[in-house]
Amino acid sequence: MGLFSKRQIGNQYETLAKQYLQRQGLRFLDQNYLTKFGEIDLIFQQDETIVFVEVKYRKNDHFGSAAEMVTNAKMRKLIKTAQVWLSQQRTMNTIDYRFDVIAIHDSGRDINWIQNAISEG
């Protein structure tokens, strides 16, 4: 598989995404939140909104962009996992939240922040 494991590479790009969002003024809350439904890479707060972030990386876009890697099944898992996180915070019905994607290309030189990338509908 190469010098680094898939998890190590994922951690590297999640760190890059985390730093990017912090530079944009978002407040970091949690990372790699895991439930039986799935995992959320990053959780931030922007003003009064909780932001659940899926980080995707692609070396190139020959087979589609990083953002296109978020499948319907992955979206459902993210939504269920976010609902668990919100219920544990006791804020599920009282706070706004959204799902964003950070799409990273070209070894981190190209970072695309897609807000409201995933909807519950």
Swiss-Prot record:
It comes from the Bacteria. Belongs to the UPF0102 family. This is UPF0102 protein VP0448. Pfam families: UPF0102. InterPro entries: Restrct_endonuc-II-like (IPR011335), tRNA_endonuc-like_dom_sf (IPR011856), UPF0102_YraN-like (IPR003509). It comes from Vibrio parahaemolyticus serotype O3:K6 (strain RIMD 2210633). GO terms for molecular function: nucleic acid binding.
